[in-house]
């Protein structure tokens, strides 16, 4: 429920990014799981396409990051994730790899 309360804040950030980032620069957005990726894709329609970390039929509970995922996080301007309760595999990488996001 607390994540739903964050939704207006997320929309505001996305809106500000479209104003701040130059028109020809692509915003690099990463979503952790498919439901979040679907929502972010809808919001970014016409602006860009977010990358997805946990794809296919993988479970976020026992997921292990690959080097390609670490690169996604490192290059991201904005990262959407549920939190450490569901995606504990992202907690440390977000603190160390994705400092600019």
Model-found features: residue ranges?
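Bacterial N-terminal signal peptides
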Residues: 8-19
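Extracytoplasmic metal-acquisition and chelation regions
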Residues: 2, 8, 24-101
């Amino acid at each position: 429920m607390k994540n739903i309360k964050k939704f207006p804040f997320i929309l505001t950030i996305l809106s500000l990014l479209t104003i701040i980032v130059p028109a020809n620069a692509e915003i690099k957005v990463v979503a952790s799981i498919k439901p979040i990726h679907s929502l972010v894709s809808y919001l970014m329609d016409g602006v860009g396409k977010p990358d997805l970390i946990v794809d296919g039929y993988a479970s976020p509970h026992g997921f292990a990051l690959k080097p390609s995922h670490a690169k996604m996080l490192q290059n991201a301007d904005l990262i959407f994730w549920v939190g450490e309760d569901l995606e504990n595999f992202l907690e440390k990488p977000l603190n160390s790899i994705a400092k600019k996001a």
